[in-house]
């Protein structure tokens, strides 16, 4: 696939209607569209529709496992949380972690607008690295992390024990638009992102690592049994 063809395909997928006119998903899709508008207004980086559909598919695929929990580490809690809940079974919950109270408020309102019960969301207004160590190990099917490059390795190490076997860590924008491959780049952010990718290679047979051309480059780390 040429670069032009890929861009055209991605644009087409992102242009598909994100809102169903009727059916059980209609209120969720409408809430996602509203949350995306709010994120843009506040200058937050939210995953595009293509990435969001992958998140929904990942949580839907985990619906038969013993764990139906997910964690969102991102300022765009409303958008990410809704996509995660969209694919979850009714007992599934999303733990939203971000220090900004306004981001937490937006997520609560978005979940309510989508028709989700208050118990479906757990809200921790804290820095991720301050609370992840206190969360139950092997209890989450998916962790979505949009963090600064300098925090990537610490977040990887903190979230890895939380995943159930078969669970996936989604590292959004972790490839920095492929600048990690440019060895001439020595700035702190690029060096940290590159080091995080090198660290993942040490996981060996404990994980399956996948890279997807979503956003600035997304890395999926799936824990094996």
Enumerate the predicted regions with their spans.
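A short alpha-helical cap/connector motif
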Residues: 1-142, 147-164, 168, 174-225
